[in-house]
């Protein structure tokens, strides 16, 4: 049985990715899209459109208002919010990280956090889902199993992440112009300044019972898409045990793959809903855990479709497997292993 799905914000990078994925989905039918025209938002019309699910690729501060109105007007529909408006546990924490009051505080705590692999038990039947941030996804997928099993210290975790430029959105900014990005590489919002830190720490506390304070440093790569994150952790066990724990956590996952050998590369994951993880020994009592994903797919639109599938009771992989004709993890890993021998 098919379902009608509407997309708010289809003119942004994430919104366009949603539309592309939905057009290939075997059970979802694209009912309508809204976008913006020369900076003027044109989303109001979507509130009057009947659909079984609504995907909100809107800026934070705006998305919560639409989520609230959709929940009130169409309570049986699934609403997946891809902004940061519903990710944090309190209105106070939202104001701290986003710098303004929440537009729909009554929704806080109602949404299921959409880190699909970690919240699979809560997503079936959910009617309000908060999609994680792209950086948060790259950090949480490796850390949740390791902290939950008490295999690493909860203090002194450093997350060093590099993202393609689409992670900054389509807003016209001088620092995102080609001549500013090309042949350059820069860090921004270092330490505890990036708003994704708040959701990372909140989810780690909720899913693992541990209070973690991350040092997080994001960087902007001169590429279109992809995130490569290096997590520097202090293990309580050897690296082989860390790897086994991650393999056990994701052995039945369609999209999260623990790989041996060289760390994952952006080319392994761009265009897919995959996240690839590898574990390596470090010096001075540390280990390094790498994760790689596509910020627009597993970090945004693909995970939103995955959450929609779970909420609707559809196969989790609908519309996502080989959606871009990308090689499978086995093919890519085998090819690289052959080239390195």
Could you describe each region identified by the protein language model?
Residues 17, 141-145, 199-203, 245, ...:
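Alpha-helical scaffold segments in soluble metabolic enzymes
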Residues 229-341:
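C-terminal active-site/capping subdomain that shapes the small-molecule cofactor and substrate pocket
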Residues 13, 110, 134-141, 191-199, ...:
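Conserved active-site and cofactor/substrate-binding residues in soluble primary-metabolism enzymes
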Residues 21, 25, 73, 203, ...:
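Conserved short hydrophobic interaction patches
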Residues 192-260:
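C-terminal substrate-binding/catalytic lobe of Rossmann-fold NAD(P)-dependent dehydrogenases
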Residues 1-190, 209, 280-283, 317-318, ...:
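N-terminal Rossmann-like NAD(P) cofactor-binding subdomain of oxidoreductases
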Residues 38-41, 209-219, 272-276:
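Short amphipathic beta-strand starts and helix->beta connectors
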Residues 188-192, 219-221, 265-269:
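Short Gly/Pro-enriched turn/cap motifs at secondary-structure boundaries
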